[in-house]
């Protein structure tokens, strides 16, 4: 299953691991959410929980990976088809950090079920697995992941300090400096979006009278608390 989301510059994810337990008609639903950036990491969580809860009847799972949520998987693990993994995945896809925007990714969810002796029916299972993940997400700590452009700007030694202060005053992150024989190289990080890049170039031209040029180095995803 794939997503048609547009190219992402920011998304939210779970900060570490989070657990939540729900009881429905004597069945225990233990939800474990964990940040996972690869399929291997997501499947490793399932394997770990099979060992930890080895006497449970079901270990159903779903995960969403990638800034654009391009990798989406789910597994019913013995529950009737479509009653566990799919509603879990749907709950993850509705996950968001703020403003109601569905942007949660790089997260794996496993719901461990201990059967309580009362059959829930297909509809009841769908609601139970969906609610288990939704409630876990409601209390899970989330963080932002932002894609930043790393850039380099060279300025003469005599004006580099002032330029650095001016850039910081504009809210531009200066992540490092390197002194060369005749100039200082400032390493900067800005939001990797077209409008942010254009605004930065305008500010740089204004601050330096067009005397400094920014050189793109690379892009990098970083955690933003």
Question: At which residue positions do the language-model features occur?
Answer:
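Long, charge-dense
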Residues: 122, 126-150
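C-terminal regulatory domains involved in ligand/effector binding and gene-expression control
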Residues: 1-83, 195-202, 206-225
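Glycine- and acidic-rich phosphate- and metal-coordinating loops
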Residues: 64, 104-115
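Short glycine-/aliphatic-rich beta-strand segments at the starts of folded cytosolic domains
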Residues: 142-159, 186-188
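Short amphipathic alpha-helix segments
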Residues: 154-174, 199
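Short, charged beta->alpha transition segments
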Residues: 85-100, 139
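C-terminal binding/interaction regions
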Residues: 181-185
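Helix N-cap motif at beta-to-alpha junctions
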Residues: 38-39, 156-160, 189-198
